[in-house]
Each structure stands twice: as C-alpha cells, then as structure tokens.
Amino acid sequence: MKKALAWTLTLLVTTCLWAQNTSPEPIFPIVQGFGGIFDAPHATEKPDPTLEYKVVIDVATGDQNKSEPFMSLINLARLINLHAMGGVPKENIHVVAVMHKDAMWAVLSQEAYRKKFGVDNPHIPLFQELKRHGVKLFVCSQSLYKREVPFEQVMPEVEVATSMLTTMTTYQLKGYAALKF
C-alpha cells in the first residue's frame, strides 16, 4: 500500500512539475508568422498605449544559417508584436530598419540569394509581412558597394539608402528612438 501511494505521489508531483515547465504557445498580434512572443499578463513595466512609438533600427547582424531568417530581422517583428501586446495601437508603431554589414545579405532578390548561398531567400516572406504593416526597410548603399552587389539584386521590398549612418542620423533628428540589432 505504501509503495502504491509513493508511486502515485511521485507520478502526481512529476506531472505537476512537467505542466509548470511547459511553455505557452507564441502569439503574433500584428506580424503574422514571425517574431512570436508570449503573453506577459504579470508584467508591471509595459509600453504606454497613449504614446506614438517611432523607432529606427541599425541592423548589422547576420547569422551563419542562410536558410533561416536572421534573428536580428526576426526581432523587427518581435518589436512590433511586443508593443501591440502591450496595448499600443498599430497606427502608433512606426519602425524603420536599415541593414548593413552581414545583415545586408538578407536583402538580395530570390535569384541573387540562391546564386550566392544555394538556398531560397528566407527573408522575403518576412520583409513582405513587415512592409504590409508599414515598416520602412532600407539597405546601406555603401555596404552594397563594398561587397560588389549590384543595386538590381536588391529585392523590391527594400529601398537603397545613401548609408546606414545618414539614415540613422536623419531619423533620430526626426524624433525616432535608435536601437541596434
């Protein structure tokens, strides 16, 4: 009897511990399929839904795995989704991203990306979804020149900027908060 009770208690405790450790499913309040986040009902520090959020992001980091979207670019979607989860209306979230250094490879057209890396460009659906939600996407022309990438190889969702430096300073002077990914 004691053995059966001990096994039952062990099973019950193990099941309860397992249930506590399972993660909830990510949610996608605005940007669908990218930048999944977890509801944080217990958070005490939250975005102010009455503010207009203007953010310019210096995106420099790429990843080794060229068949998956770069985490730095997934974070663009996370930023938007987190603010939305915090109650900020979509029309009060303004995001500008300028890619350079290793992140600039993400902006290649399907054909150019496949030729360079041997796989389809996984960033195209992400950029299409970001553009659909008003994100302005730029690539630094200086990074393109330095890596000898013709402007014609940039996907249509991304515009060419004079440079990351001038884009960052211009938007900061327009009141955008600066982040670096």
What is the predicted role of each segment?
Residues K54-D58, V95-M99, K136-V139, K180:
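Structural recognition of the beta-strand scaffold that forms the well-ordered cores
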Residues Q20-P41:
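Long, contiguous juxta-domain segments that are non-catalytic but functionally important
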Residues M1-N21:
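Bacterial Sec-dependent N-terminal signal peptides
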Residues D48-K66, L108-E111:
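Acidic/histidine-rich, surface-exposed loop or edge segments in extracytoplasmic proteins
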Residues Q20, I27, Y113-R114, V119-F181:
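A cross-taxonomic marker for long C-terminal extensions/tails that follow the last structured domain
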Residues P69-V88:
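Histidine-anchored nucleotide/phosphate-binding helix
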